[in-house]
Amino acid sequence: MPLPVSITTLLLDIEGTTTPVDFVFKVLFPYARDRVADFLATQGADPEVQADLDLLRQEYAQEAAAELPDWAGEDAIAAVPYIQWLIDSDRKSTGLKSLQGKIWEQGYVSGEIKGQLFADVLPAFQRWQAAGLAIAIFSSGSVQAQQLLFGYSEAGDLSPHLSGYFDTRTGPKREAASYGAIAAQLGKAPAQVLFVSDIPAELEAAATAGFQTRLSLRPGNATVEIGDWTTIHSFDEL
């Protein structure tokens, strides 16, 4: 189904929408998990890293999970078991996402990591931009991680095509208020924004806020209940 004429902005999820799910789980997560101890040993005194650790400690104090690992000691390295537990649990922790972004930056800059995108992403970005449409990202990954993925992608630097990045600091992806906040920051009426995601609960929140939506059905995505959602298999359909 072509884009509705009322749409002026596309708001895109990353995992399962612009990027294969496997890239996140088989490349990014293991990269951060394997390197977090060395990273904290060398960068743990950095004020920005300390801010991430302070946030993680606040989250740790509120955890109720029975299998929660110990966080014993004040030095940065003491946080490693909890951080690895969060990664293994795929927790949407703001502190974790921020710290992961800093670790991934080293991989992207060194060339060890290249952001993976579906083949239709760059042509779609070029087409939408030529049509005068704005493109923004909303992901549970930190803004820094988003900028790295698109700035160091296999298709080159796609950042000139993007006009905004939003993460969980704006709000949870499954709460309508988050989408209202994004529309306000973009300076758009909610009905002018099309949100594309592979998660129906996120689409529900966006629709509640007045956004138009599309359910992304990409290869490798988890099976979901399609229900009444309008679906796409490729950005070629938009």
From Swiss-Prot:
Pathway as given in its UniProt record: Amino-acid biosynthesis; L-methionine biosynthesis via salvage pathway; L-methionine from S-methyl-5-thio-alpha-D-ribose 1-phosphate: step 3/6; Amino-acid biosynthesis; L-methionine biosynthesis via salvage pathway; L-methionine from S-methyl-5-thio-alpha-D-ribose 1-phosphate: step 4/6
Protein name: Enolase-phosphatase E1
Organism field: Synechococcus elongatus (strain ATCC 33912 / PCC 7942 / FACHB-805) (Anacystis nidulans R2)
SUPFAM superfamilies (alphabetical): HAD-like
Reported cofactor(s): Mg(2+)
Function: Bifunctional enzyme that catalyzes the enolization of 2,3-diketo-5-methylthiopentyl-1-phosphate (DK-MTP-1-P) into the intermediate 2-hydroxy-3-keto-5-methylthiopentenyl-1-phosphate (HK-MTPenyl-1-P), which is then dephosphorylated to form the acireductone 1,2-dihydroxy-3-keto-5-methylthiopentene (DHK-MTPene).
Family annotation (HAMAP family): Salvage_MtnC (MF_01681)
Gene Ontology terms, MF aspect: 2,3-diketo-5-methylthiopentyl-1-phosphate enolase activity; 2-hydroxy-3-keto-5-methylthiopentenyl-1-phosphate phosphatase activity; acireductone synthase activity; magnesium ion binding
Family, per entry: Belongs to the HAD-like hydrolase superfamily. MasA/MtnC family.
Keyword Hydrolase: yes
UniProt catalytic activity: 5-methylsulfanyl-2,3-dioxopentyl phosphate + H2O = 1,2-dihydroxy-5-(methylsulfanyl)pent-1-en-3-one + phosphate
Gene name of this polypeptide: mtnC
GO biological process: L-methionine salvage from methylthioadenosine
